[in-house]
Regions:
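Alpha-helical hairpin
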Residues: 2-3, 38, 67, 85
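Short helix-capping/hinge SLiMs at alpha-helix to coil transitions
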Residues: 16-23
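Intrinsically disordered, acidic Ser/Thr/Pro-rich low-complexity regulatory segments
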Residues: 83, 87-328
Length: 328
């Protein structure tokens, strides 16, 4: 639906003022907050038109209007066309991304924690694309009770996993050297797809430690199919103080519903986007974490319909920009 430039300005004011202080918009408040050189009567007509088009609704308790779900969606779609990375509270993101000594799960957790603190809303990260990680090193360490620790270096930190199989130190070392030699610089997905061909051509060389490699590939294949969620609620205290109890209960319910979180984050686009709820629902601003153009994870900031979309989108843009720099 096409809106005139003036209607867009008025709608933006209505949304931003309601987000800021829950104040319904009137023709008088629009005139006070814009440089539009038109009469109050003209502004009243514009508000009437926006209401008739479904972007605003009138409250019974006052003469003012507030945004509808349709109004929020129009505002957010236009906002996300030109997101600026301006959040100074996210300066530490660069250091976190560049730290290769941490695990992938640590990096994801730290990023989610920083975003939650910066936006004052709970943040969820879902990792569902480890096949896109670039491999740098393998270290396999035998443990007690027929277990082995597998450490895999990647371009986004290391992955660690304890697997249920027994092996000698020598076979673990040989398997580590073999996997590093042939798959360093390749993606996890490439290794999982092609490992059988490599092993067929080298059956004599790898016979002693083939069982170790088989167990690792089996474990990584299983891990690759999993969707790992990391929920950070550092920013929730301020949100709880600001929002009414009904909104907070809905958000907490969603945070405790793993299936719903996975369903929402599975639908993340390859750019910053938002799922704006119907009236009185939960909204999610989402962004992908990409590796070589392929999705490694999805970040979702969860809040009420009346949330700070601009600030959240800016925070996510900082993270996306830093990850893109790291990827080059």
């Amino acid at each position: 639906m096409e809106l005139s430039e003036r209607k867009i300005k008025i709608l933006n004011i209505a949304v931003e003022e309601f987000i800021k202080d829950s104040a319904p918009i009137t023709s008088g408040s629009v005139k006070d907050k814009t440089a539009l050189n038109v009469s109050t009567a003209t502004l009243r007509n514009e508000l009437n038109a926006l209401e008739a088009m479904g972007f605003l609704k009138q409250l019974h308790t006052s003469g003012g209007r507030v945004p509808t779900a349709q109004g929020y969606r129009f505002y957010v779609e236009n906002l996300l066309k030109d997101v600026k990375a301006t959040n100074k509270e996210l300066d530490d993101v660069r250091k976190i991304i560049e730290n290769r000594t941490q695990s992938l799960s640590e990096m994801i957790s730290k990023i989610a924690k920083i975003i939650s603190k910066a936006t004052n809303y709970p943040t969820v990260v879902m990792v569902n694309g480890i096949e896109n990680l670039v491999l740098t090193e393998f270290k396999i360490i035998p443990l007690l009770e027929e277990k082995c620790m597998v450490l895999i270096g990647t371009n986004y930190g290391y992955i660690s996993n304890t697997m249920d199989f027994a092996a000698s130190m020598e076979n673990c070392q040989d398997a580590s050297n073999y996997l590093t030699k042939y798959f360093k610089g390749e993606t996890m997905g490439y290794m999982l797809e092609n490992i059988d061909e490599y092993m067929k051509g080298m059956s004599g060389e790898i016979k002693a430690f083939q069982g170790v490699v088989d167990n690792i590939i089996k474990g990584l294949s299983k891990m690759n199919k999993q969707k790992l969620l990391n929920v950070q609620t550092d920013g929730m205290a301020k949100m709880v103080d600001k929002e009414d109890g009904k909104d907070t209960k809905k958000i907490i319910k969603m945070l405790n519903d793993e299936e719903e979180l996975i369903e929402v984050l599975d639908k993340t686009d390859d750019h910053i986007s938002a799922d704006v709820s119907d009236d009185e629902g939960v909204s999610v601003v989402k962004a992908p974490i990409l590796v070589g153009g392929n999705k490694l994870a999805s970040i979702g900031v969860i809040g009420p319909q009346k949330m700070d979309y601009s600030g959240i989108a800016s925070a996510l843009k900082v993270v996306i920009d830093e990850l893109e720099k790291h990827n080059k």
